[in-house]
C-alpha cells in the first residue's frame, strides 16, 4: 500500500463542496466512461459525494469507494480511511468501526488513523449510552403504567 502523509480529518468531511465543484467531478467521471473511469477520478468524485449534505450522495460515495477497494489493491489503505469517514457520517458506526479497525491493524503508528479510531469508538460508546438511557426510560414508564393499573384494579 502506498503511504500518504496526510489525510483529511473527520471535520473536513462536514465541509461540502459547492454544487458546481461536485458537478465538475461527476462530469470528469462521465467523460472517462462512468464505471470505467480512472480510479483517481472515481475516488475524487466519491470523496466529494461523502462531503455532501445529501444522504443519497453520501451513500453513493461509500458505494464507489467500496468498488474501488475491491478492484484496486494499491488504494485499499486510502479507501478504508475514507470509508470509515463515510460510514461515520451516515451513522453506520459499526461499519465505520470495522473499516477503521482493519486500517489500524496496518497503521498502528499513524496518528490520524488512531484519532479517527478514537472518534468512532467514542461515538459508539455515546450511542450505546443513549440506548441504555432510552431503554431505562421505557422500562420506568412501563413499570409506572403497570403499577397504576394494578392500583386501580385493587380499588
UniProtKB/Swiss-Prot annotation:
Segments passing through the bilayer: 132-149
UniProt-listed Pfam families: Fis1_TPR_C, Fis1_TPR_N
Subunit field text: Interacts with DNM1 and MDV1.
Keywords, sorted A to Z: Apoptosis, Membrane, Mitochondrion, Mitochondrion outer membrane, Transmembrane, Transmembrane helix
Segments on the Mitochondrial intermembrane face: 150-155
Additional observations: Present with 2410 molecules/cell in log phase SD medium.
Known role: Has a role in mitochondrial fission. Has a role in outer membrane fission but not matrix separation. Required for targeting MDV1 to the mitochondria. Regulates the assembly of DNM1 into punctate structures, in the mitochondrial tubules, promoting mitochondrial membrane constriction and/or division.
Example GO biological process: mitochondrial fission
GO terms for MF: lipid binding; molecular adaptor activity
Name of protein: Mitochondrial fission 1 protein
Domain notes: The C-terminus is required for mitochondrial localization, while the N-terminus is necessary for mitochondrial fission.
Predominant subcellular localization, coarse grouping: mitochondrion
UniProt topology in membrane: Single-pass membrane protein
Top-level lineage group: Eukaryota
CDD domains reported in the protein's UniProt record: Fis1 (cd12212)
Cellular compartments per GO CC: mitochondrial outer membrane; mitochondrion; peroxisomal membrane; peroxisome
Protein family per UniProt: Belongs to the FIS1 family.
Cytoplasmic membrane side: 1-131
Compartment annotation: Mitochondrion outer membrane
Amino acid at each position: 500500500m502506498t503511504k500518504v502523509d496526510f489525510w483529511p480529518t473527520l471535520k473536513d468531511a462536514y465541509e461540502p463542496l459547492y454544487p458546481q465543484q461536485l458537478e465538475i467531478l461527476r462530469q470528469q467521471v462521465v467523460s472517462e466512461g462512468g464505471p470505467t473511469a480512472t480510479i483517481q477520478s472515481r475516488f475524487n468524485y466519491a470523496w466529494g459525494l461523502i462531503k455532501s449534505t445529501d444522504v443519497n450522495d453520501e451513500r453513493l460515495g461509500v458505494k464507489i469507494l467500496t468498488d474501488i477497494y475491491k478492484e484496486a489493491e494499491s488504494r485499499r489503505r486510502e479507501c478504508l480511511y475514507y470509508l470509515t469517514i463515510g460510514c461515520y457520517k451516515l451513522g453506520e458506526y459499526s461499519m465505520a468501526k470495522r473499516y477503521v479497525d482493519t486500517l489500524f491493524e496496518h497503521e498502528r503508528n499513524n496518528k490520524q488513523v488512531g484519532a479517527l479510531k478514537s472518534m468512532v469508538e467514542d461515538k459508539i460508546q455515546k450511542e450505546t449510552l443513549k440506548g441504555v438511557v432510552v431503554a431505562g426510560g421505557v422500562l420506568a414508564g412501563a413499570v409506572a403504567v403497570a403499577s397504576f393499573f394494578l392500583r386501580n384494579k385493587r380499588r
